[in-house]
Amino acid sequence: HKNRLNKSCRVLFSKSFYNRSILKKLVSESYDKAAGVSPARLGHSHTRLCIPVYDAHKGAMHVFKTSHHPELIREYQMPAVDVAMSTAAAPVYFDSYGFEYCPINGGQKMTYSNIIDGGIMANNPTLIGYTEAVQSLKIPVGDLAILSLGTGTNLLSDLPKTLTAKYWLYENKRFRLYDLISSAQADYTSNLMKFYQRGIGNSGTPMFIYDRLQHSFSDDDEVGMDDSSLRSLKHLENIGQELYGDYATSLL
C-alpha cells in the first residue's frame, strides 16, 4: 500500500513512477565495457537490431537499426544507452526521453525529444523483424525461423460492470490502460503472423517457422511490469522453464 501511495503522489505532482538516472548509469557502464569504448554505439552490437520507439514530438514511429543494409548509414552511430533509455520510456513509469548525438564522421548534430517506449505500437515487434528480413535483406520467406517471446497476457476476469477512468488508470496497483494498449497490439501482431504463416483459418501449409511463447496470467499469479521482488522474479523464472518444456520439441 505504501508503494501504491508513493506512485499516486508522484503522479499528482506531475512526476513519473520512477527516476531513470541509476538505470541509465548502469546500462551505460555495461555497454561501454562490452564495446571497449565510450560511448558505446548501437553499431557495436554483435547482432542485427531493429528497436522501435515512438516520437511524441513528431507523432511518428521510429525504428532504430544497426547498419545491416548499405542504406542504413545513420542510426547505428547513436549512443547505445540513449537507444535503450528511449525504448524503455514507458508512459507513466518513466518520463519521455530526449538525446542528441554527433555522427562519427562529423556530420550535423542529431536531436531527438519526447521519445517514448516503442511498446505502445510494437510490444510484439515480430512484424518489424519479418518486414526487415523479407523486404530489406531479401531473405526468402521459406528460410525464416521466428521465435517470438511474449511478455505475458492477463484475462480481465475481474471486470466491474462499468469500466471507469479509475479502472483504466489505476485499479489494484495496475496501470491497466497501458496493459490494454500493449496487449492488444501484441495479440494483433501474433494473429497477423499466423495468417502470413498458414493463411485463412490457420489451416494451410506453413510458409515459414513461427513460434510465439506467451504465458496467460491469472489474477492470483500476475506479475506487474515494475514488480522486481524476489518472489516475482522466481515466479517468472518458473514460467520460463514451463514454456520451454511446452515448446522444447518444436524449438529444437
Residue ranges, per PLM feature:
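Conserved catalytic cores and adjacent C-terminal regulatory segments
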Residues: H1-L252
